[in-house]
């Protein structure tokens, strides 16, 4: 799908932003480029659509040399999402989504159908198509930015820190949605980020760069288990190496399959009764098809008990969730580092299937850390033994 052959970018003064880069990226693969500031990751991405042109070497897309392509046509054939989102403020959401199809002279009917089809992919109502960007939240705007990159059915999408400006909860939700969307559509994604957690969560393979060169190009698991050198170890952070058992990889393997839930039409009194019976302070709210809709907690009930009568009156719809095939290490990061008490687990249709709590992770993290300490102790004992036996061997000689 995408191939770099000995690509170098040299700026005036002789500084090499990218130096002799060679790699192959397969069709449908999600590849993250990461490294410290000035490592060449953004320059590498911008050479793909010729916003920056290479000084030496060749880049091929589907075996075609991009330097032989018309740069305007090339860019229209590649999706591009940036951190600033870049929606046109004077255009409706519909007009923003079909901007590239319009440039490609699609029929009006085809453009309208494409806009309706795409808005459904990110669970936004169709009436949003007639709104303007300022009427949407930051997370909703970024969803539209992603849709615009998909609108002309581009197979290759470039993404330059697209979620970097969002708050942590919105960012987590969008990452989860986008990874699921990428799996469903089979697009090839080149994703630049400075966040190792984001790269580990999203990527099929990660390119770690330093000083314009590739230090390691491998799967997240392989990088975590076998970092190429001390730079990679320091960059990814040693704490990530012990946050989960290697043999427990997906949320579904450790989740509680009986989360306490309630439907939105129930009364607050019914909700309080369930909380007392189950000894919980939070209830997940689902519809009749068990699709996750939000949550309520005792604090909300207490604050609204004089005015609200039903669960629907106080439901908090902004709930973070993960899919059942989400890698466990990503969930560990969120619960332990970002302060989540629990995370609901859903299937591909967003039906509630389980819940992961801090308590359910205790054994996993304990075993990981304890195992690491045991290994370290064994190594120290072996070294001590070798030092003890070494002089004895000399005495025998």
UniProtKB/Swiss-Prot annotation:
One of its GO terms (cellular component) is membrane. One of its GO terms (molecular function) is ABC-type quaternary ammonium compound transporting activity. ATP binds at residues 35-42. Residues 377-397 are annotated as: Disordered. PROSITE patterns: ABC_TRANSPORTER_1, ABC_TRANSPORTER_2, CBS. Residues 255-311, 315-373 form the CBS domain. It catalyses: a quaternary ammonium(out) + ATP + H2O = a quaternary ammonium(in) + ADP + phosphate + H(+). Part of the ABC transporter complex OpuCABCD involved in carnitine uptake. Probably responsible for energy coupling to the transport system. Involved, with BetL and GbuABC, in osmoprotection and cryoprotection of Listeria. The complex is composed of two ATP-binding proteins (OpuCA), two transmembrane proteins (OpuCB and OpuCD) and a solute-binding protein (OpuCC). This is Carnitine transport ATP-binding protein OpuCA.
């Amino acid at each position: 799908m995408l191939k770099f052959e000995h690509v170098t970018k040299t700026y005036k003064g002789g500084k090499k932003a990218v130096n002799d880069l060679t790699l192959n990226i397969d069709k449908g693969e999600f590849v993250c480029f990461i490294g410290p500031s000035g490592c060449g990751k953004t320059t590498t991405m911008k050479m793909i659509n010729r916003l920056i042109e290479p000084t030496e070497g060749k880049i091929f897309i589907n075996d075609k040399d991009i330097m032989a392509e018309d740069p305007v046509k090339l860019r229209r054939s590649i999706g591009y999402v940036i951190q600033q989102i870049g929606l046109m403020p004077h255009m409706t959401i519909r007009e923003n989504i079909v901007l590239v199809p319009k440039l490609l002279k699609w029929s009006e009917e085809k453009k309208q159908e494409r806009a309706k089809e795409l808005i459904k992919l990110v669970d936004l109502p169709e009436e949003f198509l007639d709104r303007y960007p300022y009427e949407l939240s930051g997370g909703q705007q970024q969803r539209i930015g992603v849709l615009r990159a998909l609108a002309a059915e581009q197979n290759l999408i470039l993404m330059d820190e697209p979620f970097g400006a969002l708050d942590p909860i919105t960012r987590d939700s969008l990452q989860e949605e986008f990874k699921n969307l990428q799996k469903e559509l089979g697009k090839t994604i080149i994703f630049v980020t400075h966040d190792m957690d984001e790269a580990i969560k999203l990527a099929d393979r990660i390119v770690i760069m330093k000083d314009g060169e590739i230090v390691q190009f491998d799967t997240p698991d392989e990088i975590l288990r076998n970092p190429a050198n001390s730079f990679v170890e320091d960059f990814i952070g040693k704490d990530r190496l012990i946050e989960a058992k290697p043999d427990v990889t997906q949320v579904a393997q450790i989740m509680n399959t009986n989360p306490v839930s309630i439907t939105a039409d129930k009364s607050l009194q019914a909700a309080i009764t369930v909380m007392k019976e189950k000894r919980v302070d939070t209830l997940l709210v689902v519809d009749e098809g068990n699709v996750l809709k939000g949550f309520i907690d005792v604090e909300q009930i207490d604050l609204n008990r004089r005015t609200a009568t039903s669960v629907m009156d106080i439901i908090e719809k902004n709930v973070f969730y993960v899919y059942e095939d989400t890698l466990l290490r990503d969930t560990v990061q969120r619960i332990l580092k970002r302060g989540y008490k629990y995370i609901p687990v859903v299937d591909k249709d967003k039906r509630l299937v389980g819940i992961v709590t801090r308590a359910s992770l205790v054994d996993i993290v304990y075993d990981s850390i304890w195992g690491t300490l045991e290994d370290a102790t064994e190594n120290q004992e072996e070294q001590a033994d070798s030092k003890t036996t070494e002089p004895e061997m000399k005495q025998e000689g």
